Amino acid sequence: YLIMAILASLSKVYEQLIQINTKDKLFTYNSIAVDDEDGTVYFLGKYFENNSNKPKKKRAVNFHFELYKVDANGQSNNRFKSSNKYISSLALVKYKNHLACLGLYGKKDLTTSGVCLFNINQKTLQIEIEKYNPFSEQFLTDKFGNKKKLKKRAVKNGLDNITLNNIHVMENGDLIVYAEE
């Protein structure tokens, strides 16, 4: 892949030819983020393991995420995965001097139990903070009303068919997740 960072004045900041050693059928890009200050480009992708593009194999998560950083000095990358949570979607968020991966997670594949957040060190690409926030009682009440059985089932099994649409960054750095059924 050829990465070229260009300023608004159309002058080139840098150009890097990068190679990602993956089989195309086993790797999918999730998102991209660009640092407005220095033109650093971050790529996030999902790499399926065991030569299979099935999300689970033998009841275990069968993929990991790969984060790539490309700048004027070259490229670097880091891999990460959650062994006990199924991350159904994940997107890069670059705001001010922060880099994060934000998404949805579940206890099983194809269900969603809450929102996950990984704060990433921009220099090393290592995860500094990993958080899993289950859906709040207020969210479940808004969705199901006072139907206790449905809320209990949602807490136990997760919600079906939730799709991450967008992430909005507030001025103070708070993140708002837009998702829908």
Regions found by a protein language model. Give the residues of each.
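Beta-propeller blade signature
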Residues: L2-K12, K57-Q75, S113-Q126
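Alpha-solenoid helical-repeat scaffolds
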Residues: Y1-L2, A8-Q16, D24-F27, Y42-L44, ...
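Blade-loop segments of beta-propeller domains
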Residues: Q19-D38, L44, K81-I87
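Structural signature of eukaryotic scaffold interfaces centered on beta-propeller domains
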Residues: Y1, N30-V41, A91-L99, Y105-D109, ...
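Short, conserved, GDST-rich strand-edge loop motifs in beta-rich repeat architectures
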Residues: Y1-L2, K46-V61, L104-V115, E180-E181
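Extended, regular secondary-structure scaffolds
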Residues: A33, E37-L44, N53-P55, N62-N73, ...
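Surface-exposed loop and turn segments in beta-propeller and other repeat-based domains
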Residues: L17-K25, G74-N84, T124-G158
